[in-house]
């Protein structure tokens, strides 16, 4: 009887070990799949600030298409400066890409985002990740008058407003400046012409009173753009293409 109980105990322990191993392998497979999908295909993202008003509001949630595969194809074609998006697109900026990140913390961050459904992250905080309006591509010449960007596309002889170059209409919030505020003061809403480099883009906030964009940072590298919101799924009252 003791031998039977001992054998049963060993068999039960073996089954439990296999069961635990299966659970671990399933979780590992889900984790790997999650990271592949998030890095190369799409992910969800929530807007936490009001810099893209009036079109986008804090709390809006989006499906974001990753820029990883288009960037990879551009490199394979040896055309690193080719931006896989258009003027007027809303894009996601990772302004922390220029920082060196600890390898262990990077792996830990991916685990944390996986097990919290991307609600918690070590790196992806409001001071790193932004949604901005892309208004100019590499090689473009840009200037600004009364908070409206004017763009001369690379290779073109004509200068157009940012709205004329956008596939979809949008309506930025234009601030009313005090009467005595002139061009010599900061953030006057005007900017002298600038020609972008071969790997540079120019992005702005839709709320033009919010200055955390290329007007302050300067042009950003193309690889800082990690994705593009293509669908707003929350709130339901404003569901659709952003």
Regions found by a protein language model. Give the residues of each.
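Soluble "head" domains of membrane/secretory-pathway proteins
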Residues: 2-21, 41, 46, 55-242
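Hydrophobic membrane-insertion alpha-helices, especially the h-region
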Residues: 22-40
């Amino acid at each position: 009887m003791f031998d039977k109980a001992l054998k049963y105990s060993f068999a039960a322990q073996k089954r439990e070990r296999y069961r635990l191993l299966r659970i671990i392998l399933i979780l590992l497979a889900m984790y790997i799949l999650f990271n592949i999908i998030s890095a190369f295909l799409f992910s969800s993202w929530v807007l936490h600030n009001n810099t893209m008003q009036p079109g986008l509001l804090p709390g809006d949630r989006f499906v974001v298409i990753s820029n990883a595969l288009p960037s990879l194809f551009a490199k394979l074609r040896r055309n690193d400066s080719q931006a896989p998006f258009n003027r007027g697109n809303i894009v996601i900026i990772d302004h922390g890409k220029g920082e060196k990140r600890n390898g262990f913390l990077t792996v830990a961050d991916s685990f944390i985002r996986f097990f919290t459904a991307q609600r918690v992250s070590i790196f992806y905080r409001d001071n790193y990740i932004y949604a901005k309006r892309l208004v100019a591509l590499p090689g473009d010449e840009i200037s600004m008058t009364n908070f409206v960007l004017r763009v001369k596309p690379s290779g073109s002889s004509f200068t157009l407003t940012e709205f004329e170059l956008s596939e979809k209409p949008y309506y930025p919030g234009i601030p009313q400046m005090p009467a005595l505020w002139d061009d010599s003061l900061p953030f006057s809403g005007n900017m002298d012409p600038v020609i972008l480099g071969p790997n540079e883009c120019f992005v702005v906030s839709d709320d033009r009173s919010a200055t955390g964009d290329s007007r302050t940072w300067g042009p950003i590298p193309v690889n800082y753009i990690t994705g593009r919101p293509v669908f707003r799924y929350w709130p339901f009252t404003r569901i659709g293409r952003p």
